[in-house]
A protein has these predicted regions:
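Active-site beta-strand termini and strand-to-loop segments that position acidic
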Residues: 30-34
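Short, charged/polar, Gly/Pro-enriched secondary-structure boundary elements
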Residues: 35-39
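C-terminal structural segments of small proteins and small subunits
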Residues: 45-69
């Protein structure tokens, strides 16, 4: 799996219709109309997200690893 930073994941989510609801410290909280799911994306500069967290966020957002490319 490709290493992805929180910033890159946030851009992907916004392109897929997710909206930034609020910022709590370094965590950006995203939501989507018609969905109760909320995603907390840590934005720590260009530091890559850990694989387990990235997989979890992709699953919750109904995205696949192929969407990262």
């Amino acid at each position: 799996m490709k290493a992805v930073s929180g910033k890159e994941l946030a851009r992907l989510l916004e392109r897929r219709g997710w909206q930034l609801l609020r910022i709590n410290g370094s965590h950006h909280i995203y939501g989507k109309a018609g969905s109760v799911v909320r995603l907390s994306v840590p934005i720590h500069g260009d530091q890559p997200l850990k694989i387990g967290l990235l997989r979890h966020l992709l699953k919750m957002a109904d995205l696949s690893e192929d969407d990262l490319e």
